[in-house]
Swiss-Prot record:
Organism: Zophobas atratus (Giant mealworm beetle)
Alphabetized UniProt keyword annotations: Antibiotic, Antimicrobial, Defensin, Disulfide bond, Immunity, Innate immunity, Secreted
Protein name listed in UniProt: Defensin, isoforms B and C
Lineage summary: Eukaryota, Metazoa, Ecdysozoa, Arthropoda, Hexapoda
Cysteine disulfide partners in this protein: C3-C34, C20-C40, C24-C42
One family name in Pfam for this protein: Defensin_2
Record has Lipid biosynthesis as a keyword: no
Compartments in which it is found: Secreted
Length: 43
């Protein structure tokens, strides 16, 4: 699951990290973030 797929901004706020976090929560993880290579990293 890469962050560039859902990477867009609203009012200067990037939502790709939010999508990544939601993806990780759906997998039962504690959230996640997008790294410098636009890859979703779950906690």
């Amino acid at each position: 699951f890469t962050c560039d797929v859902l990477g867009f901004e609203i009012a200067g706020t990037k939502l790709n990290s939010a999508a990544c976090g939601a993806h990780c929560l759906a997998l039962g993880r504690r959230g996640g973030y997008c790294n410098s290579k636009s890859v979703c990293v779950c906690r």
